From Swiss-Prot:
Keywords: Membrane, Mitochondrion, Mitochondrion inner membrane, Transit peptide, Transmembrane, Transmembrane helix. One of its GO terms (biological process) is mitochondrial cytochrome c oxidase assembly. This is Cytochrome c oxidase assembly protein cox16, mitochondrial. The keyword Mitochondrion applies. The keyword S-adenosyl-L-methionine does not apply. It is found in: Mitochondrion inner membrane. GO terms for cellular component: mitochondrial inner membrane. It comes from the Eukaryota. It comes from Neurospora crassa (strain ATCC 24698 / 74-OR23-1A / CBS 708.71 / DSM 1257 / FGSC 987). It holds the Pfam family COX16. The chain crosses the membrane at residues 29-49. Belongs to the COX16 family.
């Protein structure tokens, strides 16, 4: 004795939209699934292209090309750095004379004291 692999369709389920769609899907799978899927992909591409263009235009406005005159003027305000001078300046600081101060806590926050 063997059991059938096909389930017996009840009459309540055969009249629904989903049952009719499943039956039509077996006959025309590309028309009812493939074509709508591909059209959504193509339409999404056309819709998202301007969004990507806006993103790159915003980036281009932020990063602009610097002219030669502006480029030459940018480096004039910099301080010349000598490694020996920086070493002596940092060595002259009094790093041993300091006092620890507690940061004021927010209301309701634990202060960490035991």
């Amino acid at each position: 004795m063997t059991f059938q692999s096909k389930k017996f369709p009840s009459t309540a389920n055969t009249n629904t939209f989903a049952a009719k769609y499943r039956a039509m899907m077996k006959k025309h799978p590309f028309l009812l699934f493939g074509l709508p899927f591909m059209s959504v992909i193509v339409a999404g591409s056309f819709i998202l292209t301007p969004a990507a263009a806006i993103r790159y235009e915003k980036y281009d406005r932020k990063v602009r090309q610097v002219s030669r005159e502006e480029e030459l003027g940018l480096g004039q305000r910099k301080r010349r750095v000598d490694i020996r001078e920086e070493y002596y300046r940092l060595a002259a600081k009094d790093l041993d004379n300091w006092e620890q101060k507690r940061v004021e806590r927010l209301k309701g926050e634990s202060d960490g004291l035991l």
